[in-house]
């Protein structure tokens, strides 16, 4: 679960970049879910919920050009480095 917090004044740009990443990533092999949410309690903060068929699909996704370009391009827009918390569904 990646969390992104925009620098003041960069919220809209980060929002658009995340929507672009969402659109491309949903086409990646093994993608079950890839949805960006805005945090209602922290303006400018976005949370990404993603699900993959296999862990190897996630690993392949992370090596995709669109992901690497996003990660490199978004750095100047962030107030703090983005964090990722791996989640496992309870069965």
Map each language-model feature to its residues.
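Active-site-flanking beta-strand signature of metal-NTP-handling nucleotidyl enzymes
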Residues: 1-4
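Short, conserved charged micro-motifs
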Residues: 9-14
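Short amphipathic alpha-helical segment that frequently serves as the phosphate-/nucleotide-binding helix
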Residues: 15-19
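An amphipathic, aromatic/His-enriched active-site/gating alpha helix that lines ligand/cofactor pockets
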Residues: 20-32, 51-84
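Hydrophobic/anchoring residues in structured secondary elements
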Residues: 36, 83-89
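Short beta-strand micro-motifs enriched in acidic
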Residues: 37-41
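Conserved catalytic motifs of the protein kinase core domain
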Residues: 44-45
